[in-house]
Amino acid sequence: MLAIDNIGIALLLTLVAGMATCIGGCIVFFTKSTRSPDRFLGVCLAFSSGIMIYISFTEIFRKAQQALGGDTFKAFLLTNIGFFGGIAIMALIGAVLPEKKAPSSHIMMAGIYAVAATTIHNFPEGLATFMAVLEGGEAAPVTFFALAIHNIPEGFAVAMPIAYATGKKMKGFASSLLSGIAEPIGALLGWFFLKPIMTEAVSGMIFAATSGIMVYLCFNELIPLSLRYCGKKLSVICITLGFLVIALSLILLSL
């Protein structure tokens, strides 16, 4: 039987890893006024898009396929069904929502989608961190530190659109806090309630749908806004930088 002390330590470290998103969220306090969209917002949105697209295809999609059976045709097919299912869900939501006329409305919706998608992604990630620390071994500290570093750009990606849409930097920071706290909550829910029903197949489909949701958000909301505010050339550069930052964090995670 697992000791209560071990469970407490695992939960504490999961909380710390999740709260690393707040470090990324703190960046909003060091930016200039968020009252009106400008070139800097376009840069931030493009950078956030790079982060989310890269992590969707190289981490979340891959995790989904592994959970659904690994390198098999069936697993790849189910992962794609979940991926395009997530896109379809977002498209349906967009179809029933009222049309966004003001720029701030576009930015707010992009921010809300980003918070929702990242939070969903962080629930199972929190459980994974919790279990890795609980099981111990050499992989535990590496998993903890890598996921913590990996969460920093995610916090930035969700905080900036909310800060610009509302003109309130604290609200942007709060959105990163909400996203990060999903990890310890996911650990608790998974450990006490969802473990009996959270099969590999269910987890895989959730990951696949989350991947589709994040990609749809980037191409439908974040990238068009970045093109509007900072232009094509700078958007491409910043998207590529987003790829690079998240790639480095995933390389660290794989050590």
Map each language-model feature to its residues.
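Intrinsically disordered, metal-sensing/regulatory segments
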Residues: 1-255
